[in-house]
């Protein structure tokens, strides 16, 4: 019930911010649509997305925080509920989504953690994603059904991350006023 689907606030801009960018290319190469909680009230909340490039497209579920320390709340929830976490990971696999972490801690932060959850405990952010280079599919109505099914199957992961995110808000780790920069 907190998901924002207003296209004015959920779709990327075509113009690129060229400040501090040497290339000064005016337009983006990729475009995206995000389905997420309202950014000003829920900064850094997990989200579903669909994106496309000139030669590929993809979709998935992601959770990135601008405070790396905030992501430890996700790790804590994984440790507290490893069965629920692994069920959510399996749900994402069933949806055809692949796990990826853009940044990881080099040091083992949880040396006593069970082996099956260890790969996820070094992540500073996470996503489960799908990519395709078959651009003929992008104009197909069946892609919408595919997205709906994948996002529905991945719902346990979104719920898991939303619980971790709500813990961050409750503990004051992430504050809505921090989003206004």
Predicted regions, residues:
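Charge-dense, helix-prone N-terminal extensions
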Residues: 1-181
